[in-house]
A protein has these predicted regions:
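Transmembrane alpha-helical segments that form core, pore/gating elements
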Residues: 1, 18, 111-170, 265-272
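Cytoplasmic-side transmembrane-helix entry/capping segments in multi-pass membrane proteins
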Residues: 32-43, 87-100, 119-124, 144-156, ...
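Loop-to-transmembrane-helix transition segments
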Residues: 22-52, 118-126, 166, 173-192
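Hydrophobic transmembrane alpha-helices of multi-pass small-molecule transport proteins
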Residues: 18, 89-109, 235-254
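C-terminal transmembrane-helix exit sites in multi-pass transporters
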Residues: 70-94, 218-237
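Hydrophobic/small/kink-forming positions within alpha-helical transmembrane segments
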Residues: 19, 41, 45-49, 71-76, ...
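Helix-helix packing/entry segments at the starts of transmembrane helices
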Residues: 63-69, 144-157, 194-225
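Transmembrane alpha-helices of multi-pass small-molecule transport proteins
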Residues: 2-46, 77, 129-133, 153-169, ...
Length: 272
């Protein structure tokens, strides 16, 4: 299957899953912010399709390492925004993000082949697209759009865009039972992960969310060891330790920053 077709089936099963859950819980999928959903879906589908393509063209570790540059771009984004506003940049969280990325490199051990330059650029493009998508999620969170609704429209519109891309490229294939099971699992777990990610970026601290996103790599290693009898070298263990330290440091630093902001706001109210 081509990358667009994989996105189509992932989106299809995701939309069906959310529709059933919302119907059973008495929620609603009606929205007043359809334009924002279109923008978010375009960014998301483009990102996933390019990621699937790049993954098929280059070394897995290198591809994933480049994808995880999104938190670095986000940290740079926050530094620039802080400078423009005349505020202090969140350096403690930025340092934690850089530390986490070093851990990612130690675990993934990226290496760029001579024929992987273009796929590498595509991966960096995906990282930037993801950054734009996260900002779009934050905007929709400010509009009080629930995370399940954001993901539902991402799946529905993604299904449409992916169907067009599939017809224009490889065409559709009929999967066998094993393929259906794999696609169903991919759609279900991707949707659950997407809902959690959307909620964290839409309603939480974006820098902290991006740093904690590094934890997916240690979990992947743990699954590889427990389910597929993979081995872990000392360098990877050290990298996983750095990722753990980075996540905890970012959480503590964010909590302190939020406490200072609350204290400053309280003091401002008392003096006014």
């Amino acid at each position: 299957m081509g990358s667009f077709e994989l996105v189509f089936y992932r989106s299809l099963f995701g939309a069906i899953f959310i529709a059933f859950v919302v119907a059973g819980s008495g929620g609603t999928l009606k929205t007043e912010h359809f334009r924002h959903h279109i923008v978010r879906s375009l960014l998301g589908v483009t990102s996933v399709a390019l990621w699937f393509y790049a993954l098929s063209q280059m070394h897995f570790g290198t591809c994933m390492t480049l994808i995880y540059t999104t938190p670095l771009f986000m940290a740079l984004n926050f530094i620039i925004l802080a400078k423009c506003k005349g505020e202090r940049a969140p350096w403690a969280v930025v340092v934690a993000i850089v530390t986490g990325f070093i851990g990612i490199c130690l675990v993934m051990k990226p290496g760029l082949g001579t024929d992987e330059f273009i796929p590498a650029l595509i991966c960096l493009g995906v990282a930037l697209i993801d950054l734009a998508a996260y900002w779009q999620m934050k905007q929709m969170g400010r509009l009080n759009e629930p995370s399940y609704r954001i993901v539902f429209y991402f799946c529905v519109l993604g299904m449409v865009f992916a169907a067009v891309g599939t017809v224009a490229t490889t065409g559709f294939h009929v999967p066998n039972l094993t393929g259906i099971a794999g696609l169903l699992g991919m759609g279900l777990f991707a949707t659950l992960g997407q809902i959690c990610t959307t909620r964290s970026y839409a309603y939480g601290n974006m820098l902290l969310s991006s740093c904690l996103g590094f934890s997916a790599v240690p979990f992947s290693v743990i699954f590889g060891v427990t389910l597929f009898d993979e081995s872990v070298d000392p360098l990877s263990l050290f990298g996983m330790t750095l990722i753990l330290i980075a996540g905890m440091s970012a959480a503590v630093a964010t909590k302190r920053m939020e406490a200072k902001q609350e204290a400053a706001e309280l003091a401002s109210k008392k003096t006014s």
